[in-house]
């Protein structure tokens, strides 16, 4: 094992550990709260489910990383690759849609518009979110089912490639695989568009609210303004981290067709782990209960608060 492989394994292991800790923290805090009160808000439910999916996603990515390093032939074999791709695709798409649903929920609860359509959605926010979550599940199943044709084409052109008979038929099949693989990325467009729309509405709502505050001569740092800013930070961070994740996903997916196949796959795998860990940490900072518990935990660790003291999770 060379220096590059060693650095790859260290980075993968570090990001995996941090991601697991962050998402398990969310599970522990929200799970403890639900256990005590037997109630869970819609936003907490989405965040908790999202954290669980990201734990699974991180495990899939780590497994993929170790197979790339220690058993590349097994990784590229038909059945193993298909199991990883199916698990990754379903978990990945569902987690992205849940993050999108969270952005829509924040938008409907915080933004203020007088348009009849927006008011209709705002008054029925719980029902809207239930339908969005069901739609997210169906779309995630659809994106996973779309892999069937991709698997068939991949099997055909890999079989031709193994014979080292690079014919026009081989080039045609490879082009078809490229096309289907690229078209498969279009499943990412709907959640991105919805997230961008939620972000835009919150920006417009914040601008109008700020102008009203200035006209009334009141402070612009009121709870409504802070809620707008917090939601905007969460949605914007998801948007940019997802773009980075999408780039990494493309690098990892098309690694077989790049000059330095193994290096491309390793870079892609390391980059993909940053999103499920980074965005979950931002969710902690944007959620008052999670943030307070996190601060209390840090104070306990640093010795500024006695372990017996009651923080948000114990109260």
UniProtKB/Swiss-Prot annotation:
- For this chain, the annotated S-S bridges are none
Chain positions carrying an annotated carbohydrate: 165
Query: Residues on the Extracellular side?
Result: 1-5, 63-93, 149-185, 255-265
Stretches in topological domain Cytoplasmic: 27-41, 115-127, 207-233, 287-315
> Can you supply a Gene Ontology BP term from the record?
detection of chemical stimulus involved in sensory perception of bitter taste
GO CC annotation, single: membrane
Q: Which InterPro entries match?
A: TAS2R
GO MF terms on file? bitter taste receptor activity; G protein-coupled receptor activity
- Its membrane topology: Multi-pass membrane protein
Q: Which UniProt keywords apply?
A: G-protein coupled receptor, Glycoprotein, Membrane, Receptor, Sensory transduction, Taste, Transducer, Transmembrane, Transmembrane helix
Annotated TM spans: 6-26, 42-62, 94-114, 128-148, 186-206, 234-254, 266-286
**Role of this protein:** Gustducin-coupled receptor implicated in the perception of bitter compounds in the oral cavity and the gastrointestinal tract. Signals through PLCB2 and the calcium-regulated cation channel TRPM5.
- The protein's name is Taste receptor type 2 member 3
């Amino acid at each position: 094992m060379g220096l590059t492989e060693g650095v790859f394994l260290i980075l993968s292991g570090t990001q995996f550990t941090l991601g697991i800790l962050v998402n398990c923290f969310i599970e522990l805090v929200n799970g403890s709260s639900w256990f005590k009160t037997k109630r869970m808000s819609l936003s907490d439910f989405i965040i908790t489910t999202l954290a669980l999916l990201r734990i699974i996603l991180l495990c899939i990515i780590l497994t993929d990383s170790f197979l790339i390093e220690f058993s590349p032939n097994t990784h590229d074999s038909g059945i193993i690759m298909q199991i990883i791709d199916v698990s990754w695709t379903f978990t990945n798409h569902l987690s992205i849609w849940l993050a999108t649903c969270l952005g829509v929920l924040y938008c409907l609860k915080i933004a203020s518009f007088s348009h009849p359509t927006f008011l209709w959605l705002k008054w029925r926010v719980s029902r809207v979110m239930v339908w969005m979550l069901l739609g997210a599940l169906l779309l995630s199943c659809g994106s996973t089912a779309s892999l069937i044709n991709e698997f068939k084409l991949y099997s055909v052109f890999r079989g031709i490639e193994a014979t080292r008979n690079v014919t026009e038929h081989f080039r045609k099949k490879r082009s078809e695989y490229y096309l289907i693989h690229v078209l498969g990325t279009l499943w990412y467009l709907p959640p991105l568009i919805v997230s961008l729309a939620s972000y835009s509405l919150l920006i417009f709502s914040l601008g109008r609210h700020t102008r009203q505050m200035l006209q009334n001569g009141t402070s612009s740092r009121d709870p409504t303004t802070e809620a707008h800013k917090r939601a905007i930070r969460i949605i914007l961070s998801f948007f940019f981290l997802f773009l980075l994740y999408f780039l990494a996903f493309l690098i990892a997916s098309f690694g077989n067709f790049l000059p330095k196949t193994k290096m491309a796959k390793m870079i892609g795998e390391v980059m993909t782990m940053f999103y499920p860990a980074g965005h979950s940490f931002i969710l902690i900072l944007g959620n008052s209960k999670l943030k307070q518990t996190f601060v209390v935990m840090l104070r306990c660790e640093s010795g500024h608060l006695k372990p017996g003291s009651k923080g948000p999770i114990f109260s």
